[in-house]
Structures are given as C-alpha cells and as structure tokens.
Amino acid sequence: MDYNKLAELIFPDITGTVNDLEARFPKRDLPEGAKVTRFAPSPTGYMHIGGLYAAMISRKLAKQSGGVFYLRIEDTDRKRELENGVEEIINSLNKFDLGFDEGPFEGSPVIYAPYKQSERKEIYQICVKKLMQEGYAYPDFTTAEELDEIRAKQEAAKVDIGYYGEYAVGRNLTYEQIEEKLAAGEPYVVRLKSPGEAGKTVVYSDPIRGKIEMPENMMDVVLLKSDGIPTYHFAHAVDDHFMRTNMVIRGDEWLASYPLHKQLFELCGFELPEYAHISPIMKMEISVDEDGNEHQHKRKLSKRKDPEAAVGFYQEQGYPSESVLEYLMTIANSNYEEWHAANLDKTIDDFTLSLAKMPASGALFDMVKLNDVSKEMISTFSEEKCYEKIMAWAKEFDEKLYAFGTEDKDSFMKTISLWKMSGNKVRKDVGKWSD
C-alpha cells in the first residue's frame, strides 16, 4: 500500500510536519542534569494524597537539579471534567507551596503551550499522520460487535486477549476498501500497527525498582478515537516529547504500560524520558474473622473509604502545609528523618531527594506519626506565625474563630501563648488548627 497516499486520505487538512513541531518546541536550554518534570492530572476537582505525594517528588527533583516543573491538564475525557477543576488543582498545590514554573495559568511562559490536551489536537494528528506515512498506523473500522467476536475467539483458543497479529483484521484492508468505507461515512479509529512480536522482551532499569524485564508490546492500540481525540498513551508520548520532559514520576500501576510507551517513543523518533514508578500510599486495615480473630492487611488509601485519602481533608483539619510535606518526605526517603535531626535549622528545600532511597513497596500512611510531625513543626512557629496561619485557616473553615481573631487580636494572641508555652518551655500539644 502507498502509505503516503493513505495518510493524505485520512488527514487531508493536516499540512504541518513533525519537523515544524520540533522547531516550534525547541529543546530547553538548561544545565546538564536538569530534570524537566510534570504533574498531569485530569480536572476532576478531587486530589488524592497520592497525587500530592507525586507532585512533591516531581517538583523536588526538578528544583534540586535546576530544572523545570510544569502542570499539564489531561482533559480529553470531558465527561469527567469539573467546572473550575484546573483552578482547584492549582489552588490546592499552591496551598502546599508546590507551585509550577509553567502551566495553563496567567503569567506562565508560553513557548511549550498549550498545556491542556484538549487544545493540542492538531499536534497529535500531525504525529499520527507521520506514523501512517511510515506504515505504523492505520484506520480501523472494526465495530464493537466485531471486537466482541474477536475476544470470544481468543477466549476459546486460550490466547492473549487483544487486537493484534491475525486478530487485527483492520490491518488487511486495501486502500480501495478504506476509501469505500470513508465514502459510506463509517466511523473509524486510528490504531498503531505494532511491530512487536510474541516472545520478545524489553528490559528496563527503574531508578526505584531496579532492573525489570517485560514482554514487548504487540497490541495495535488505539491512537486516535473516532472523534479525533488521542488516547492517553499516545497523547502522553507526544506531550512529554514536545514539552521536553525528561523525567516522569508516576504510580506503579503504570509499570505495565512501559513496553507500549517505549515502543511509541521509538516509532515516533522521540527520545524516551526516564520513568520512575512510585509505590502507592497504603493503610493498615484490621479485619475480624468469624472466630473473632483479628487480621491485619495493607490496602491502598481509598477515595471511597478513607477521608484522609483526599488532600482537602488536611486543609479542613488545619494541618500546616509544612507538616504534611515534612511527613510525606519521611515516606519518600528513608534517610530524611536522620538528615532532619542533624539539620534542625533547615527545611525540606535543603534536602536532596534520592529516587534510589524511595520505597519499592507501598509505604504505610500513619496518622499518629503525621500528628507527631505536625506538633513538632508547629512548636517551631513563632506566635505571630501561628496567628497568621490560624487566621488563614479559620477564614475558610471556622467562622467564629476567625471573628474572634480579627476583632480582638491581643486576646487571641494570649490564647496562643497559653497552649504554646509552659514557662520558658515550648509545648507540643497542638498538631492542627482545629485542635
């Protein structure tokens, strides 16, 4: 088949080239070793404590290396998008002093913009067109019913489930057949024509987990959905390349996607960033069996079950942002507490985070320890700083306390002295402003 002719048939209005994009989004002029990291949430309005943890690590790695930390919004799924969701994300992270160098906000540099995936449709289509010209992408008209039939055959044959090899029937269409289907208005997606083979593996060295070997990707995954919007896998590859990301911090649930992502970068001619897969934050749960015996087991913090899974919980309770980040850093690096004990006059900004010292298995979230860390942190605040932070919290969460603090500051300051000092000794009784 003439792949150039096919690409023009599918993308007649796309005249830009990948070379144009390379010129539009040049390599960043940064010091050697500088990390370009990102936080790339969906604008659902909800932020999990695990998201805050990942953002803290990503920002820390960028800042300690003289790099860039930016915000990218993955808003291609409009059904899940919440009005003001982007502002909620930015405000949440700003409250924890985790600001961005770039992103979809006023005052940001714009050379690598737009920072919302919904505004980058043409960029993705340019890249898919190039893949099609090179024989690595094709239009697929397979219906949902036909996909179900393929799955049933695979289950009966007890082979891998998916769209690949002999089961990727869309690969076999001729140019004339494709032309006829387009003329008939049949809907289609654009798929990757994977060169992967069964039995082959890829070897990956994760900076947290070490050497990992996985099967090569052989699935013809969807690159563009029927509405022309990219899937997550393809969009992330294109965006990370043209935003010049060189370090990606993500949850270990994405580890299985590494072979596909590696393949996408290679076929597009992009340099693969370094991926580090962090373990989820866990919770110890106690269950009782029918005989009355208690059993402990770890599970992930759940948005549905655990109020402490939401970042908003810590804001509502009045934990200082410094306390939460301090505690998360003790989870992130096993040597942080020892470093902190020897450097009481310094903050986490002075600490050098090491991916090699991050836990490879899920760390337990301990509310008791968070409270202890927070009591210690608050004990270092001056009374004036306590007042300012209490007022900022109370303005949003405690109307009566805010009124008292604004109408009679002198009396309010005396109450701070009562719980903060015992003679000349600093007390450590308060761990959050709601106390």
Residue ranges: model-predicted function:
Residues 130, 137-301, 310:
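Active-site cores that bind ATP or allylic diphosphates and position pyrophosphate for catalysis
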